[in-house]
Amino acid sequence: YHYLTGKNVADNQRLRFMTGDYYKLINEDNRRVTVGLNGMWWHYQKDLSGYTLGQGGYYSPQTYLSLAIPVNYRQRTDNWSWELGGSVSVSHSATSSRARYPLQNLLNNSIQPIPDRYEPDDGGSSNGVGYTLRALIERRLSSHWTLGAGVDIQQAKDYTPSHALIYLRYSMAGWQGSLDMPPQPLVPYSDFK
C-alpha cells in the first residue's frame, strides 16, 4: 500500500500485489535453465494519468492485471558468463471516468475562463500482449578487469523501455574464482533502487 502526495497534484492511493514462481529445468553449478509464471495486480484510487493542472501524469489505472511466462538460460565457464532470456505477457487495464481538473481550487476564473473546467475525461479498458528479450555476457580479461555487454528489449503497447550497454569493471582485490551467474551488469541510474 502506498499513499501518494505531491504539490499541486491530487493525492492518490495505490495497492500492488505481485507473485511468481519458477521451476529449474536444469540446475547445475555452471548451467541453469528456468521457466516461471508471474502475476501482477495494481489498483489506484484515482486515474491521474492526464497532463492537465492537478493531474499527476503517471500511469494509474483503477485495475491492472498481468500474467507473464519467463524463460532463462544461464551458463559460465572459466572466463565467460552469459544469460539469455525472455518472456511473453498478457495484460488487462481499466480506468474510470475522471475529472479533467481534479483540484478545482487551483483554477482562477478571474484570469481567464476555462471552457472545459467541469468536463470529465472518459475511462476505458484495454488488453495487451508484450514480450521481453534479454542477453548478457561477461568476459574476464584479467584478475582485475572484466568486460561485459548486454541488451534488454521490452515491447508492449505504448511502452518500450529497451536499452543496451557495454561496460568495463575493475576489481581492486582481483578475482580468479567463478564469475557471477548470471552476469551482474552495471545498473542504469533510472533503474537504481
Predicted segment positions?
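Transmembrane beta-strands of outer-membrane beta-barrel pores
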Residues: 1-7, 23-25, 39-45, 63-65, ...
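Outer-membrane beta-barrel translocator/channel fold
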Residues: 1-12, 30-66, 187-193
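Extracellular loop and loop/strand-boundary signature of outer-membrane beta-barrel proteins
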Residues: 3-9, 18-22, 52-60, 118-123, ...
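Outer-membrane beta-barrel "beta-signal"
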Residues: 160-193
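Residues on the lipid-exposed face of transmembrane beta-strands in outer-membrane beta-barrel proteins
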Residues: 17-23, 39, 69-75, 86-88, ...
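Repeated loop/turn-to-beta-strand initiation elements of outer-membrane beta-barrel proteins
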Residues: 27-33, 79-82, 141-149, 174-179
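Residues that define the transmembrane beta-barrel architecture of outer-membrane proteins
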Residues: 11-17, 29-31, 61-67, 78, ...
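Outer-membrane beta-barrel translocator domains and adjoining extracellular loop/strand segments
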Residues: 9-16, 45-54, 95-103, 160-165, ...
